[in-house]
Design a protein with these regions (language model features):
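Active-site and adjacent substrate-binding regions of carbohydrate-active enzymes
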Residues: 1-172
Length: 172
């Protein structure tokens, strides 16, 4: 099963050896002084136990990317993902001043759940500004919504671009 491209490896976090090995890999790099980790598509790491195919997304535009043409009901935010993230965070908490950033493309009400109770991501990336209209009122409303949804102690963040998006200068 590949979420994005056949050449990109997928790990089966349901296999009993995978998570302990990943946590050991994290410790390896933390012992060497890295300040933390940016975890790509952290909300998609855990797959459906039955490896069911995703259903078509009835709301997808005809020219949508293949990823957006399906509804990720079996691979996005699957039950158990928060437990895995908590274990990753516990490893980071064994070290001083380390952090974990999670790449999560979700609406605010779902995004903020990845802070946990201060025991999951230090910062789930907030990508909402990337797709908002470049309008001060719309952006202001969103900022109020996002900051109002942050859990106590949650660090806000504002992503305007990344390797998956066109540069901001070409979007505004």
């Amino acid at each position: 099963m590949h979420q994005f491209h056949r050449a990109q490896p997928e790990l089966n976090y349901r296999h009993p050896d995978v998570l302990p090995a990943m946590l050991d890999n994290m410790r390896f790099w933390l012992d060497r002084g890295v300040d933390g980790f940016r975890v790509d598509v952290i909300w998609l790491m855990l797959k459906d136990e039955q490896f069911r195919d995703e259903p078509p997304n009835p709301h997808a535009a005809p020219d949508a990317r293949p990823f957006d043409q399906i509804s990720h009901v079996y691979t996005a935010g699957v039950e158990g993902i928060h437990d895995i993230i908590k274990q990753m965070r516990a490893v980071l908490d064994e070290y001083d001043e380390r952090m974990m950033v999670g790449e999560i493309y979700l609406p605010v009400e779902q995004l903020v759940t990845y802070y946990g109770d201060g025991d999951e991501c230090h910062m789930p990336f907030n990508f909402q500004l990337i797709n908002l209209p470049w309008d001060a009122r719309v952006i202001g409303d969103y900022i109020r919504e996002y900051e109002g949804a942050l859990p106590p102690g949650g660090w806000p963040n504002w992503v305007l671009g990344n390797h998956d998006q066109h540069r901001i200068a070409s979007r505004v």
